[in-house]
Amino acid sequence: MEKLWGGRFQGKSEAWIDDFGASISFDQKMAKEDLAGSLAHVAMLGKCGIIPASEAAEITAGLKILQEKLAFGELEFSTVNEDIHLNIEKLLHEEIGSVAGKLHTARSRNDQVATDMHLYLKQAVAEIIQSLKHLRVVLVQKAELHVETIMPGYTHLQHAQPLSFAHHLLAYFGMFTRDLERLEESVKRIDISPLGSAALAGTTFPIDRAYSAELLGFSAVYENSLDGVSDRDFIIEFLSNSSILMMHLSRFCEELILWTSHEFQFVELTDAFSTGSSIMPQKKNPDMAELIRGKTGRVYGNLFGMLTVLKGLPLAYNKDLQEDKEGMFDTLETVQTSLDIFAGMIETMKVNTEIMEESTQKDFSNATELADYLAKKGVPFREAHEIVGKLVLECTQNGIYLQDVALSHYQEINPLIEEDIYVVLSSKTAVQKRNSYGGTGFDQIKVALENAKKTL
């Protein structure tokens, strides 16, 4: 089959080489955007008198026919035509004849593909933003149910200090809020039109770039044509933001995996988000959480791959840039699906509140409370720290906890200790008293929830 760019060439190409160079297997995802870009471009050509209005109307009608066929899955693409742009042009030629060749006036595939990617990513990021907003709602709703649910807080995966489970959930709410802000902020760099940059230097035709940008819903145009066709920062920024978002999902999934284990039993995932074993009938595995954790590395790989492709490219277009799409498509799909599954897991999981709270009774996470108690009695904190540390060692040797120590023994250690120490050492009191701004105290959690709801 004759190539649309074949005038310069005499030799015939070979099918296996065509297959290697073709991108239609994946860039056909942008068929809708390619048709939209072409409709805007031909409208601009007609408006500016670059082609006759009658021909612009004929091309427009042909493109709309292709849009209808695309919607019904009736368009067939070929690797012979390499990419989505040449496939669309070939199909348009079959619909309306040689006038289709005028569509590419004042346009290059360089600005055409960049336009497609801006359009595609803009819509896809908008959908991810909506899913992220939904996840934040789910977290707030779950947190509201567990303001007074007590759990161990960890450092080094060792019991550190007791927390409200709501406080833990709201920590992730803060992370996902920053993810949301990053994605929303990045839209202004996606929402720029490269259309009209042509190959790299602009065009001699009297085009109106602002008009085509307006038709496509872009808020601005690239000020430099060379930058317009060369820029892939907007994709790297999306991949970077996605990597951070997936990292947050992965950290929470790691905790869910631990919490569902027999050793923890803090939560139970519903059957929909779990799988069994082919040999061990008792197993209920947190596969969806594990997959999100695993797919985080995949998203990181897409970011590093894109950075590596771009690091040595001179301006402007190079065929290497064909490698900018698959990682973007894969990341979009991975992030979208991961968000939806994760929100479902959190929304439907059962929280074993009694087991969580019991876990804080069988540890020394109240040791800081005893040290603070002594400090408030006038004992220098470092001295209090030393006293409590020795007492913890004594307790571990005797197989008891701080709340099991007799008052008489406490008073031998320091006569300032009174009977109220047992109230102080309760995990609920420990949580309730941490009412510094942003702390885990119940009053602070309620304030945090109200503030969070204002941002939903």
Curated annotation (Swiss-Prot):
UniProt record, GO biological process: arginine biosynthetic process via ornithine; L-arginine biosynthetic process
GO cellular component: cytosol
InterPro entries per the UniProt record, alphabetical: Arg_succ_lyase_C, Argininosuccinate_lyase, Fumarase/histidase_N, Fumarate_lyase_CS, Fumarate_lyase_fam, Fumarate_lyase_N, L-Aspartase-like
Pfam family, any one: Lyase_1
A GO term, aspect molecular function: argininosuccinate lyase activity
Pathway it works in: Amino-acid biosynthesis; L-arginine biosynthesis; L-arginine from L-ornithine and carbamoyl phosphate: step 3/3
Domain of life: Bacteria
Compartments where located: Cytoplasm
Catalytic activity as recorded in UniProt: 2-(N(omega)-L-arginino)succinate = fumarate + L-arginine
Key words of the record: Amino-acid biosynthesis, Arginine biosynthesis, Cytoplasm, Lyase
CDD domains assigned: Argininosuccinate_lyase
EC numbers for this chain: 4.3.2.1
Family: Belongs to the lyase 1 family. Argininosuccinate lyase subfamily.
Protein name from the UniProt record: Argininosuccinate lyase
Organism listed in the record: Listeria monocytogenes serovar 1/2a (strain ATCC BAA-679 / EGD-e)
Gene label: argH
